[in-house]
């Protein structure tokens, strides 16, 4: 499995197709009631049938993830002579906040004569107001 989810929860990666369904019939019915959904009696009957909670014929192995990517980047940087500081593999905030944080780290080391690499992986978000242009990476860089 290649994970694009922080922390690699297998049931969340690609909506968890290789995992047992952890939701319950009761939860499904609560959603129907909460949103006052109109469903057929046949659908209502199907929602009363529990799904298997274990899968015995599958093994999930995360082969690639943000954590693995950060490790590989660290190895590559060290091979090239950089002094590496691993910050996080769970960056999870507004892109603007991440940019401010990373810029402060870079500025505090701008006079260093060493070759430095600061590594951070994760996922940033941008909340757009009005007509925005660009995306998370551009927002972080600006």
How would you describe each model-predicted region?
Residues 14, 20-101, 108:
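Accessory alpha-helical/coil subdomains and C-terminal extensions
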Residues 99-103, 141-142:
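Short, hydrophobic/amphipathic alpha-helical packing segments
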């Amino acid at each position: 499995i290649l994970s694009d989810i922080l922390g690699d929860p297998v049931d969340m990666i690609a909506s968890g197709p290789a995992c047992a369904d952890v939701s319950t019939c009761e939860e499904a019915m609560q959603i129907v009631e909460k949103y006052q959904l109109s469903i057929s009696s046949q659908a209502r009957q199907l929602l009363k049938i529990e799904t298997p909670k274990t899968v015995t014929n599958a093994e999930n192995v995360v082969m690639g993830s943000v954590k693995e990517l950060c490790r590989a980047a660290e190895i590559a940087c060290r091979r090239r002579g950089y002094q590496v500081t691993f910050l996080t593999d769970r960056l999870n905030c507004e892109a603007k906040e991440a940019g401010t944080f990373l810029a402060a780290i870079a500025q505090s080391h701008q006079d260093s004569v060493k070759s430095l690499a600061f590594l951070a992986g994760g996922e940033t978000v941008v909340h757009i107001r009005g007509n925005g242009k660009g995306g998370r990476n551009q927002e972080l860089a600006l």
